[in-house]
């Protein structure tokens, strides 16, 4: 659907192209194509996006809507972020100096206003005091959740062994003889346009789906927590958020569980909302709360950034980078993949895979990977 809408918007070479979250539901390859297209697009583009890498690649100007106003910046996302943070810091520092000066003047006035010999100086300082105006720093509309995954148990050397897994769905071989071993320091990104293959692999590893052939084995020191791509069944209940989360906590205390919810921006009575009434972003934050509460040393994420705002994506990204355990994840956000993964597994359309210990950017630039893709494409054409 997204690709069809993009094709409609791009048809006819418009003078102004308006794009509202164009990268939603696009895989990384499609996003890369869109980036290159927009970079070369000669007319005006106005885009709303939560994808930081995409904004850095495409945008030459940023319109920041915050503090009840719109502020324009020349530059890409990173330049805007650094500039906006610098402006706030400078305002706070300037206000601090003004407050110190105000205190100094008030103390002088209070001390010498009744002293005849100092009355002129006191009056002069009163005038100076009246001229000092503090800059109004309005509260930001941006709220950052606190995401910190802390495993309760250190992971051992034997993490996961996958041997010869195959799976056919609706007559299509989604996974074909997949084998890999996961080490204790791996953060593996599942990439490629074969979305069904990635989700099927996650479901098998989470015990939700049986492979047609092959096997897998988790190490005895591992504990797994899984973020599913489709959470419809999970939230099809009238159970309260706090009650649902408590079942995953060793500490069966509502106050303890509410602490996790508070970090994830569920304030006050939000914790007693029913599961089924939550928005897309709230559902994601509840699932991330569950993963934090469980304290697992292996995290599996299947597209966790869907429905999240930029602040939550940034917080999740930082939490994944800091996590001392193993991560297996699929994600449409280039920056999350690049900054988190130290190993790439690409699932190809024919059900096979490419496995490489590298960062995502290095993987994309690799001649070896380009040759492997070319061989695969030639084989497909021959078939």
Regions found by a protein language model. Name each.
Residues 1-95, 149-383:
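ABC ATP-binding cassette signature C-motif
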């Amino acid at each position: 659907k997204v690709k069809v809408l993009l094709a409609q918007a791009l048809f006819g070479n418009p003078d102004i192209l308006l794009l509202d979250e164009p990268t939603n539901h696009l895989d990384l390859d499609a996003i890369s194509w869109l980036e290159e297209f927009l970079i070369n697009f000669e007319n005006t583009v106005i885009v709303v996006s939560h994808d930081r890498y995409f904004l850095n690649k495409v945008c030459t100007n940023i319109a920041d809507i915050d503090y009840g106003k719109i502020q324009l910046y020349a530059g890409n996302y990173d330049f805007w972020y650094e500039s906006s943070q610098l402006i706030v810091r400078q305002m706070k520092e300037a206000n601090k100096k003004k407050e110190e000066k105000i205190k100094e003047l008030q103390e002088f006035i209070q001390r010498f206003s009744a002293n005849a010999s100092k009355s002129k100086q006191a009056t002069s300082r009163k005038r100076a005091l009246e001229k000092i105006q503090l800059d109004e720093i309005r509260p930001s509309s941006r709220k950052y959740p606190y995401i910190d995954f802390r495993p309760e148990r250190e992971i051992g050397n034997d993490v996961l062994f996958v041997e010869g897994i195959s799976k056919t769905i609706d007559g299509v071989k989604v996974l074909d003889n997949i084998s890999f071993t996961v080490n204790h320091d791996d953060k593996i990104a599942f990439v490629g346009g074969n979305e069904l293959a990635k989700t099927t692999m996650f479901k098998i590893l989470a015990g939700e789906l049986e492979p047609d052939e092959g096997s897998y084995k988790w190490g005895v020191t591992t504990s797994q927590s899984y973020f599913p791509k489709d959470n419809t069944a999970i939230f099809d209940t009238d159970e309260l958020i706090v009650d649902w989360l408590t079942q995953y906590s060793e500490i069966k205390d509502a106050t303890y569980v509410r602490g996790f919810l508070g970090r994830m921006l569920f304030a006050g009575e939000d914790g007693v909302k029913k599961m089924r009434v939550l928005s897309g972003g709230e559902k994601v934050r509840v699932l991330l709360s569950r993963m934090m509460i469980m304290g697992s040393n292996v995290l599996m994420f299947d597209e966790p950034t869907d429905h999240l705002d930029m602040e939550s994506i940034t917080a999740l990204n930082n939490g994944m980078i800091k996590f001392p355990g193993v991560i297996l994840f699929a994600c449409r956000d280039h920056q999350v993949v690049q900054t988190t993964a130290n190993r790439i597994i690409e699932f190809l359309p024919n059900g096979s895979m490419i496995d490489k210990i590298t960062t995502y950017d290095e993987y994309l630039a690799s001649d070896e990977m380009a040759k492997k893709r070319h061989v695969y494409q030639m084989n497909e054409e021959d078939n």
